[in-house]
Amino acid sequence: MSLHSTHNRNNSGDILDIPSSQNSSSLNALTHSSRLKLHLKSDMSECENDDPLLRSAGKVRDINRTYVISASRKTADMPLTPNPVGRLALQRRTTRNKESSLLVSELEDTTEKTAETRLTLQRRAKTDSAEKWKTAEIDSVKMTLNVGGETENNGVSKESRTNVRIVNNAKNSFVASSVPLDEDPQVIEMMADKKYKETFSAPSRANENVALKYSSNRPPIASLSQTEVVRSGHLTTKPTQSKLDIKVLGTGNLYHRSIGKEIAKTSNKFGSLEKRTPTKCTTEHKLTTKCSLPQLKSPAPSILKNRMSNLQVKQRPKSSFLANKQERSAENTILPEEETVVQNTSAGKDPLKVENSQVTVAVRVRPFTKREKIEKASQVVFMSGKEITVEHPDTKQVYNFIYDVSFWSFDECHPHYASQTTVYEKLAAPLLERAFEGFNTCLFAYGQTGSGKSYTMMGFSEEPGIIPRFCEDLFSQVARKQTQEVSYHIEMSFFEVYNEKIHDLLVCKDENGQRKQPLRVREHPVYGPYVEALSMNIVSSYADIQSWLELGNKQRATAATGMNDKSSRSHSVFTLVMTQTKTEFVEGEEHDHRITSRINLIDLAGSERCSTAHTNGDRLKEGVSINKSLLTLGKVISALSEQANQRSVFIPYRESVLTWLLKESLGGNSKTAMIATISPAASNIEETLSTLRYANQARLIVNIAKVNEDMNAKLIRELKAEIAKLKAAQRNSRNIDPERYRLCRQEITSLRMKLHQQERDMAEMQRVWKEKFEQAEKRKLQETKELQKAGIMFQMDNHLPNLVNLNEDPQLSEMLLYMIKEGTTTVGKYKPNSSHDIQLSGVLIADDHCTIKNFGGTVSIIPVGEAKTYVNGKHILEITVLRHGDRVILGGDHYFRFNHPVEVQKGKRPSGRDTPISEGPKDFEFAKNELLMAQRSQLEAEIKEAQLKAKEEMMQGIQIAKEMAQQELSSQKAAYESKIKALEAELREESQRKKMQEINNQKANHKIEELEKAKQHLEQEIYVNKKRLEMETLATKQALEDHSIRHARILEALETEKQKIAKEVQILQQNRNNRDKTFTVQTTWSSMKLSMMIQEANAISSKLKTYYVFGRHDISDKSSSDTSIRVRNLKLGISTFWSLEKFESKLAAMKELYESNGSNRGEDAFCDPEDEWEPDITDAPVSSLSRRRSRSLMKNRRISGCLHDIQVHPIKNLHSSHSSGLMDKSSTIYSNSAESFLPGICKELIGSSLDFFGQSYDEERTIADSLINSFLKIYNGLFAISKAHEEQDEESQDNLFSSDRAIQSLTIQTACAFEQLVVLMKHWLSDLLPCTNIARLEDELRQEVKKLGGYLQLFLQGCCLDISSMIKEAQKNAIQIVQQAVKYVGQLAVLKGSKLHFLENGNNKAASVQEEFMDAVCDGVGLGMKILLDSGLEKAKELQHELFRQCTKNEVTKEMKTNAMGLIRSLENIFAESKIKSFRRQVQEENFEYQDFKRMVNRAPEFLKLKHCLEKAIEIIISALKGCHSDINLLQTCVESIRNLASDFYSDFSVPSTSVGSYESRVTHIVHQELESLAKSLLFCFESEESPDLLKPWETYNQNTKEEHQQSKSSGIDGSKNKGVPKRVYELHGSSPAVSSEECTPSRIQWV
């Protein structure tokens, strides 16, 4: 079991390890000594491996301890039985440090020759309590404590064992036996102090291990006088078998025999405390106690209690220095101590301060509500101690649950009744103590709606909850603890999570005066998830927090005034950030360091009340959608509980905003507690059981909490440790090492420099703190003034009338108060520059809604225009006098109650217009029911009107279908008649030809004989043709008769349907006029709500100037009625239907869009790609319908439903040649000529894929190329399909996709290209570097692709329905999105350094590719290059600023800093010049071709590499300036890369040799030479700083260069030929972007 695994839970222990007065320990000396040894060894494990000079010091430190149990004899000499008097011989080492230890000061007369001093521990039994003890069965505690680096000369065997006897002195506790203080000064009394306890807590569940707890209310043991504890580094006992067996006797006998087994598995993963498992550790576990032991609390910020369970020591390899030292020393010689000071100063506090802690779970049972008492609800929840019992009323099954703490708030008369104070003291107060120690803490409340969560967390004014008590206690403790050495700074934030969106409750509008937009969650690589742009306000007193809390709660009420926005559906998160600044003195200097604690107090949303509405699943669906956070929270808790059982599972933190933000609180760095509130009533049994199971799983979560210290604390500890080393080395002059002494002094200097830098930063932060505090105060005043207009009053006048808000959530009712001043008070919509006295938000609130007049104590309300204003449920249209208690509803969703204090004082009774029911409470339910009753007739009229309109639309559809059928049959009849006429004309021609033949026969009698055979043949042919024509004529007439019969049937069926619907319409009209009771419509609150929602949707659509109209669509029959929402697009002439659930979700999106004043994603709120659109038949005359329009209307569901059983066969071409008969043609008249092209298309796609697979490596493209190719396929496919649709014949009966193989192929290719686009984009974007610009472009590209998919769906749906307007609109939007998306791809390709082969041979491609598409790609490349160069310039400025802040120690570092600054400026000039060149090429040159963009893309990786190398080189330089060791080879590599890349850029800047070009070329050459010189000088300075031997040559060089510089002033030349880097001076006339020296004049620039 490792430190981060589960601690033992104790059902009877106090929360968060509150100490028990019955517990004590007898393992302090044993476990502390072993722990101290592990700690000291782990502290130096890394530095000894890295620095061989410190290994000699490491051997002294590992062996050095103040006391060791007598090691003067070898193990073989030790007796096999313990000393009868119970003595343990301890040895105390000599020391030269007289200031570090009290024992050393008492024994100054001890000489250095004394190698050993006896020290004994004696155990005596108390005579007065002997009867209470049973026979002590002593099982020895055998454990292996192998000390690394020890040999036989230490007198300690590697298999040494310890024998510890533990007895019980009280019930259910372990008490160390008392030891009297002997007269011998070498004897130490081991007293059982209640403030120092160590206990084994009884496991509360099966399969849980026993953990050792360490508790202290005083400083840790290591910081006490050494006369109280044994600080032993070596333990010598008899060689027994390695077994840990602790047996405790007492009233509740508790046998722990599996401790060793569990501890042996432990591996401490913190602070390099990795330990090996002993070779043999056989134990067993027995639990016979009935009473559980209370857990202890350790307020000290350490992990001692976690380390107590780790009794194995990792053996350190022997060092050769230590071995040689031991060979030369005598057998019993022990090395002197050097680090007692270090132990006294730092051993008392564990610098790691990491603790494993499980989530503490508490359950609170609330009392019955008034409603439950009236209904006489039965109690099903009972409590006995910490056990909660639930009895199911139906199944009679009994459920038992045990938690850390159980609060019984059901009955105030109960002896264990838990009040608000009890809940805070037991659950929240320990969290506050842990927060002062530097841990993050979290407390969240969970339970169903109405179970008491908000009461527990916030409470009321007379009974405050956890949050107000926590804040008040926080500042009271801060006032007590704040001193000159310790100061406190506290910040707070308050936000809510509603519908997966975060709203800041402390800010009501943004900087532009608009409503604050939802915030986003980001994740920091170190500090974890955080809310971006969340306001953090500094608070200095509890009054500040009270005012901010009140403001936040009232803002929450303001946001929840809408009918659909329920506050019970949102989670509120209250966060405090406490920073403790502590001052310490090191060598007389004052240093500060900080400890930060983050406190989260969370009120989760209520769980779904689905069990009370089994018949309706809409409520449950809404809850699943809105409360996604609760569902994900359950998943996270379940996964974490499985992880606690050593299972590797995925934790879905990021599926919800709430769990993402609580990542550290659940399984991370936090001390977390949870309180689950439940109802005792039988009606809530299912929610109660669900909550208890939820809480039971949360108990298994293990957090790894650590103290949040800054770097100063670590630096101060290291500085003190180094100072202590030097003092010890000075006292021990015989073992002094000059090299080591010099290194220690150098390290102290480095640490002091770091510390001073940190202090400068902290001073700057202190100044920022003050500025933030002043800004917070100003912002609070501004928010108060703004919120007064929104009903948030902090000061109330008891004489003025007022309006108080009513809300469905009782927690938010009566939170807003609007004062009615003397005179006129105007009410209107909330706007940035609005002058209204009362400003309300909402779609149905008009700009000027109403006016309230208060004259002489009489208050009246006057509506303005058509604004919806209701008084006591009645819609008013004129001035109305308000009386005390009246209900005022504005806009349909703002509910208020009117209060008139003057009328109440005068004793006036409410007006007679109040109904008898109005004597009850005037709450939201009362006002809602009153409005519903008053508006019942209006709602009934709306519903009947909607049903009547639906019937009329159906009749209109049938009439259209009838007329369309009539047109189709008329066209068929005309076709048959024309065919008959053609056949008759052919028959007449044949008869005339026969007559002509007879005349010819008479004239040619002389040829009769010759033509006799021909005559017979012709007569036979004429007879056959005549018969054939007669048969065809007969068949045509028969077909005409059949169609006439079918036509008559169609007309008869349509007429019957028309008469049926006409009768229903007549009945509806009669019921509407006569108000017949036989036709009633049940009016419910949902109908009223739906009417308001439709009005809101139409108002939003009208104000945003969209073309969507929403209406109610009711279809009723004898059995049931179906209500849906019809959505019409007036621009495209199409309509669709939404379900009520979908309409509610879309309306929420519309509201959000309306509040944000519209955005580029506005279309998504009004339409959905999944919608099934159809042609709108409303107001569509039949005479205007073309063949294509008729074909699209036939696909309308309302029209096609009428003709479902009647099929009209199409008329085929009956033309036949003379050579073919009727039987040959009849087989093809009704055959389906369309064939399936799908297999062939798929075959071609597979072939093209194989061709791509077979391409050579030279033809490979990047992912960016593939993305652009996919966009190009979609781009061309849209144009081709749209063109084919336009060219289709208007009178064609075929669908666009039915017979055109090319269109089918294009459609499939477009769909495949989009799929490939999505897959490639996910891979490509996941590989991008983390950057603000890249992240923004990545989000925008994702959004564009999502919108493209939606418009492609609409485009194909329009093609299937033959709706031209829909096709054109979708194509236009999709083309715009494609062009914008390829711009983003071009920018990202440049920023990522990816090549674009697509631009190769761009001029040739432009002929076949759309020119707009190529221009979009090139525009993206140009923008990407601009962003890249700007980021390079910004990075150069950042590096200059960072380098400028560094201090220099000598001339070498000063020169190194100067050269580095010059190098940065040179590269900054490269970026600036490249930016100018790129812009000049794009703007000034007309022949800027695609090849230029290709070169631009190829340059991008070089700029990225140059930026990276510069950043890395400056980091190395800064590290060297700070005194840290750096890698010279890495710096050389970076500088060499910079020189090569700069050389390429300078060659690119060169121009042809002209008069101007030659001058620019010379300037470029000089600048290049300067960069080369700076690079070489920088490397030389760095080598000089890293190598101390080069200091003297550098000084010589520096002196020579100064002399040469003086000579160069007089002679004008530089004759330096000495060591070092030569200094070249170039003089140029004119201006140039170079760095000038001090001797430069305005007309001349000197280059060095």
From Swiss-Prot:
Residues 825-891 form the FHA domain. Pfam families: 4HB_KIF14, FHA, Kinesin, Kinesin_assoc. Induction: Up-regulated in cells progressing through G2/M phase. Residues 1-356 are annotated as: Required for PRC1-binding. Residues 358-701 form the Kinesin motor domain. Gene3D superfamilies: 2.60.200.20, Kinesin motor domain. The modification Phosphothreonine is found at residues 277, 915. GO terms for biological process: activation of protein kinase activity; cell division; cell proliferation in forebrain; cerebellar cortex development; cerebellar granular layer structural organization; cerebellar Purkinje cell layer structural organization; cerebral cortex development; establishment of protein localization. Residues 356-737 are annotated as: Required for microtubule-binding with high affinity. GO terms for cellular component: cytoplasm; cytosol; Flemming body; kinesin complex; membrane; microtubule; midbody; nucleus. It comes from the Eukaryota. Keywords: ATP-binding, Ciliopathy, Coiled coil, Cytoplasm, Cytoskeleton, Disease variant, Meckel syndrome, Microtubule, Motor protein, Nucleotide-binding, Nucleus, Phosphoprotein, Primary microcephaly. The modification Phosphoserine is found at residues 12, 272, 346, 937, 1292. Microtubule motor protein that binds to microtubules with high affinity through each tubulin heterodimer and has an ATPase activity. Plays a role in many processes like cell division, cytokinesis and also in cell proliferation and apoptosis. During cytokinesis, targets to central spindle and midbody through its interaction with PRC1 and CIT respectively. Regulates cell growth through regulation of cell cycle progression and cytokinesis. The kinesin motor domain binds to microtubules with high affinity and has a robust ATPase activity but a very slow motility. The kinesin motor domain protects microtubules from cold depolymerization. Binds to each tubulin heterodimer resulting in a microtubule complexes. Binds at the tubulin intradimer interface, at the crest of the protofilament, and orients slightly toward the next protofilament. Directly interacts with PRC1 within a complex also containing KIF4A, KIF20A and KIF23; targets to the central spindle. Directly interacts with CIT depending on the activation state of the kinase (stronger interaction with the kinase-dead form); targets to the midbody. Interacts with ARRB2; the interaction is detected in the nucleus upon OR1D2 stimulation. Interacts with AKT1; the interaction is detected in the plasma membrane upon INS stimulation and promotes AKT1 phosphorylation. Interacts with SVIL; at midbody during cytokinesis. Belongs to the TRAFAC class myosin-kinesin ATPase superfamily. Kinesin family. It is resistant to docetaxel anhydrous. This is Kinesin-like protein KIF14. It comes from Homo sapiens.
